[in-house]
Amino acid sequence: GPGIIHHIWITTDNKTSEGDCFVLRDLVLRMYWDGEENPSVEAPLGDFFCCGFGKECYINSSLITVVPSRGLNSYIQMPFKKKAVITLENQHANAIPAFFYQIDYNLYNYLPEETEYFHASWRREALTELGKDYVIADGIKGSGHYIGTYIALSTLQRYWWGEGEVKFYIDGDEQYPTICGTGMEDYFGGSWSFAKHENGKTIEQTYTTPFLGYPYYSRHDDLVNNLYHNDDCPPMRGFYRWHVMDPVFFDEELKVTVQQIGVGHKGLFERQDDLSSVAYWYQKEPHNVFSKLPEKEKRWPR
């Protein structure tokens, strides 16, 4: 260094057998800047690239692009002053037959003293706590700006799931959020349940855009073909939102949460679902150590 990583391209298998089919959650991506001992980036490979159920999906956005067939691309700018170390830990049960990558970077004479470093952290609650907001990011101390959210949602209850407000608590705000949204589908740029109507049924429409998207919906395990059971799954939804044009700045600390609120025929109600997420942000070092990543079995989708 000094330098900036401008582009990362990765492709790999998504399963090694019918029984070992969550490669994208078993591979753990980590990034270290300037000799630090604790990673600034730690997430399952698929989730980092907004593919959170062990299955790739088409994404055409400004920061993350996923194209056929399983071409994982990041255009997130990643500066470093001395050196950058990127590792991939294989926690999968088997060797991965195919894994290819390319990292494109430039070296510079210097980077400004105020340069902030890229961070990303993964979390999951396999069953959210009733009446308690799901935490997307917490313990972020220092100055920086928040640039994005990815959420993988497996709904475990009936009816509409997306009324929970996304909240940002900035620089000491605790009792009330500094920024409070109007619902999860609104935060990801949609409205009115993403709905269209076909044959008397309401269908959610998926989409992918430069700054926000709902690229993945499925009720089926597309990775498994078994003659003795069907492929039904709890409904799975993947969303991303990039704060490129609307970054969320903080000087001291940041916390990001989302309510667990749905609505049915009798009105609003508190939900319990299976949520996992990746938070993406820049900050000056040092950063707080992330919570320990769960064992691979506890990362697998339902």
Where do the PLM segments sit?
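Beta-strand-centric surfaces of beta-sandwich/beta-rich domains
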Residues: G1-R302
